């Protein structure tokens, strides 16, 4: 069997062939053992067709996401120690078009029993992700309620593929056909694959290159659903690739994060902040709309000023990552407030210079980030070089930076920057702002009914537009 397999592994993956051969040979051994323990005849008569349409779920105007439940992998080892499938499924169910579940035991610490556990929690189709080489596995996947399977052309010849795909389709299951190079892509097209997954991972050295999606996607006929797989870590990468792919399969980058809810938001919606929160209800509105960060303003002259106790009360409303906004405060005071409240970051909105930032960095716990805001009128300012985790650009009107409700000339921005953008953002201009390639957007007066009063409808409108891509 390994000789037959070796013939069909693409030339580009020859150096990795022995690893794939080992994985697949181990899979054949697993299949024989499983057939003995759970013969096909014991469950085949009970099989029903899937009623969750994988192909339909991946259709539509917006970018789709197949989010993956993955405990471990050969390249990364153990990825998620606390593998709470109920929690994972409850988060994914809010954002995914389909959910992928690793079922390979030896290399990914998966199990077929994971499939029904996830499926019971969600309404979306569930994809069984495994090294499929035998029709028995397809039947087994359906027995455990999978609605779709992965077929990898790096380990299947055309006849094997046709056989497995036919079994899947007879059971009402969809097929995600994975390719990793142009040769496999040509085969997928000839095999009339409805959904083609482009694996950005190089099977020779396990590195990832997102340009593979850009190179291969234009070769795929119109009407085929294109999914970009592997190496997706940021919303900016998603936006960059969205014109080449209909959707993304994302697993490892999410599974590695302890706060899965915010990790998914960051990739699907972006790393956005709602600033000027003054009440726990407003924190709830921001969180429910899709925000990652919540801003608390400790500048007394601001209409949205909060003291430490009001900030603590506001923070109790929702589990956002909270950012304290300060302006020319003594560094020791900033560090004290940030530490007391357990802030995610402090944002400096005054004339704080490098010496101040160095002093503050030495006073803050390492886990608390430092963000620096700059006012922009007609030119981009020089950014502080050290100890700044994020730079934020806001409109400067006269001597006032920030809180003006105005935008600066966005044509000044570099394409695909690591900057946060603030100033006059609202439902009217958010779609345009989202295309600028910034790391995140910072909303305040544009989502309010009155200063310091966030408007749930305006927030929902803004975040719905952020999802329209």
From Swiss-Prot:
Keywords: Amino-acid biosynthesis, Aromatic amino acid biosynthesis, Decarboxylase, Isomerase, Lyase, Multifunctional enzyme, Tryptophan biosynthesis
GO molecular function per UniProt: indole-3-glycerol-phosphate synthase activity; phosphoribosylanthranilate isomerase activity
Keyword Amino-acid biosynthesis: yes
Statement: the UniProt record of this protein carries the keyword Magnesium: no
EC number: 4.1.1.48, 5.3.1.24
Region (Indole-3-glycerol phosphate synthase): 1-271
GO biological process: L-tryptophan biosynthetic process
Catalytic activity: N-(5-phospho-beta-D-ribosyl)anthranilate = 1-(2-carboxyphenylamino)-1-deoxy-D-ribulose 5-phosphate; 1-(2-carboxyphenylamino)-1-deoxy-D-ribulose 5-phosphate + H(+) = (1S,2R)-1-C-(indol-3-yl)glycerol 3-phosphate + CO2 + H2O
Pfam families for this protein: IGPS, PRAI
Pathway entry: Amino-acid biosynthesis; L-tryptophan biosynthesis; L-tryptophan from chorismate: step 3/5; Amino-acid biosynthesis; L-tryptophan biosynthesis; L-tryptophan from chorismate: step 4/5
Signal sequence extent: none
InterPro entries: Aldolase_TIM, Indole-3-glycerol_P_synth, Indole-3-glycerol_P_synth_dom, Indole-3-GlycerolPSynthase_CS, PRAI_dom, RibuloseP-bd_barrel
Role played: Bifunctional enzyme that catalyzes two sequential steps of tryptophan biosynthetic pathway. The first reaction is catalyzed by the isomerase, coded by the TrpF domain; the second reaction is catalyzed by the synthase, coded by the TrpC domain.
Family: In the N-terminal section; belongs to the TrpC family. In the C-terminal section; belongs to the TrpF family.
Subunit structure: Monomer.
This protein's name: Tryptophan biosynthesis protein TrpCF
Gene source species: Vibrio cholerae serotype O1 (strain ATCC 39315 / El Tor Inaba N16961)
């Amino acid at each position: 069997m390994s000789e037959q397999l070796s013939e069909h592994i693409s030339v580009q993956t020859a150096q990795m062939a022995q690893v794939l051969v080992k994985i697949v040979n181990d899979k054949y051994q697993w299949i024989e053992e499983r057939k003995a323990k759970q013969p096909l005849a014991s469950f085949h008569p009970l099989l029903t067709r899937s009623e969750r349409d994988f192909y339909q779920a991946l259709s539509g105007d917006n970018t789709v996401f197949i989010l993956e439940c993955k405990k471990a992998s050969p390249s990364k080892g153990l990825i998620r120690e606390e593998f709470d499938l109920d929690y994972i499924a409850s988060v994914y169910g809010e954002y995914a078009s389909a959910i992928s579940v690793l079922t390979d035991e030896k290399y990914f610490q998966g199990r077929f029993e994971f499939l029904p556990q996830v499926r019971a929690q969600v309404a979306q189709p569930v994809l069984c992700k495994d090294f499929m080489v035998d029709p028995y596995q397809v039947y087994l996947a359906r027995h455990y309620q999978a609605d779709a399977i992965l077929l990898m052309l790096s380990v299947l010849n055309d006849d094997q593929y046709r056989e497995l795909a036919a079994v899947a389709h007879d059971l009402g299951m969809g097929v995600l056909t994975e390719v990793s190079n142009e040769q496999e892509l040509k085969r997928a097209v000839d095999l009339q694959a409805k959904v083609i997954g482009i694996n950005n991972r190089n099977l020779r050295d396990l590195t990832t290159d997102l340009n593979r999606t850009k190179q291969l996607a234009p070769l795929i006929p119109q009407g085929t659903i294109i999914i970009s797989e592997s190496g997706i870590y940021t919303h900016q990468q998603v936006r960059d690739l969205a014109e080449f792919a209909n959707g993304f399969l994302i697993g490892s980058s999410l599974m590695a994060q302890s706060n899965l809810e915010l990790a998914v938001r960051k990739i699907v919606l972006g790393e956005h902040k709602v600033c000027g929160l003054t009440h726990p209800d407003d924190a709830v509105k921001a969180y429910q709309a899709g925000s990652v960060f919540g801003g608390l303003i400790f500048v007394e002259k601001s209409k949205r000023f909060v003291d430490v106790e009001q900030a603590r009360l506001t923070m109790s409303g929702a589990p956002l990552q909270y950012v304290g906004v300060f302006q020319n405060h003594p560094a020791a005071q900033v560090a004290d407030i940030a530490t007391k409240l357990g802030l995610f970051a402090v944002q400096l909105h005054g004339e704080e210079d490098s010496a101040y930032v160095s002093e503050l960095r030495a006073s803050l716990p390492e886990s608390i980030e430092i963000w620096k805001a700059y006012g922009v009128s007609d030119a981009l300012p020089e950014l502080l070089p050290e100890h700044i985790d994020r730079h934020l650009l806001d409109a400067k009107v006269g001597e006032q930076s920030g809180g003006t409700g105005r935008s600066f000339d966005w044509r000044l921005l570099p394409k695909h920057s690591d900057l946060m953008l603030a100033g006059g953002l609202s439902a009217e201009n958010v779609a345009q702002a989202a295309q600028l390639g910034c790391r995140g957007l910072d909303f305040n007066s544009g989502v309010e009914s009155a200063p310091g009063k966030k408007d749930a409808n305006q927030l929902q409108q803004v975040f719905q537009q952020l999802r329209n891509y």
